[in-house]
Design a protein with these regions (language model features):
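Phosphate/nucleotide-binding beta-alpha loop and adjacent structural elements of enzyme active sites
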Residues: 1-242
């Protein structure tokens, strides 16, 4: 009977594979970033920074897994922020900031793409898409400065999706990192030249690792020209292990 069951499983799996699918045992970790974040954080009301909020996709995902999160969202693009205001301005405990975060305070040229999710402080590279519809000088603050101004002692989750600018965002949180006041970092890692001057993935990974963080998991990989294009990665400081 055991032999028959195994043979039947193999036949079914082979048939499914021929259709381009597979059957795998699901691990507890690494399947859904937001479920992993909820499990690690534990609190029902975490403090979250959503840097590169765009149209509020991450806000929506976080509110599905946390009953009452406090979310500080940052979106420097004018078109994207206007849309964000219309859809998310009345949500409780969500603060929308038309502001960029980087490594140091100042002003910097921002390239707004007609595809708002491709807007960046970096010019488009050979693997990027869309086109620049506007470029303007905008204010840049830092995670450290914002937390000081708003008396935020700790960040449970620092999420950054800023199209090649994520390393600068994390560098701007050096004070909190040194004080061990950030529990999780969730960011996009890019493998192709979507922007000019984008730092290589290993440089970002090394910087985060040097702050004492450890990788929880990579999540969905997206592909360009049959090569890895980008993915999201979650890091935890071992001080906050569950």
């Amino acid at each position: 009977m055991h032999f028959i069951k195994n043979r039947l499983k193999n036949v079914v799996r082979s048939s499914i594979r021929r259709m381009g699918y597979d059957i795998r045992k699901q691990d507890l970790i690494g399947q859904d970033a937001y479920l992993d974040i909820r499990r690690i954080v534990g609190s029902k009301s975490p403090v979250i920074f959503d840097v590169g909020a765009n149209a509020g996709q991450t806000i929506d995902d976080l509110r599905k897994v946390f009953p009452s999160p406090t979310i500080h969202a940052f979106e420097p693009g004018k078109v994207a922020f206007d849309s964000l205001l219309q859809t998310h301005s009345k949500l409780p405990h969500v603060r929308l900031n038309n502001l960029a975060l980087g490594a140091k305070p100042g002003r910097q040229i921002f390239f707004e793409n007609y595809r708002t999710d491709m807007s960046s402080f970096l010019p488009l590279g050979p693997d990027g898409w869309g086109y620049i519809s506007n470029q303007r000088e905008i204010e840049v603050s830092t995670v450290d400065r914002y937390c000081s101004q708003h008396e935020i002692p700790i960040i449970d989750l620092l999420k950054s999706d800023t199209q090649g600018f994520d390393l600068e965002v994390i560098k701007g949180a050096q004070g909190l990192l040194n004080a061990r006041k950030i529990r999780l970092i969730y960011l996009e890692l890019t493998f192709q030249k979507m922007y000019q001057g984008i730092p290589p993935m290993d440089e970002i990974y090394r910087f985060i690792s040097d702050q004492g963080f450890e990788l929880v998991s990579f999540y969905t990989f997206y592909y360009l020209n049959e090569r890895a294009g980008w993915t999201d990665a979650l890091f935890i400081h071992p001080q906050f292990q569950i």
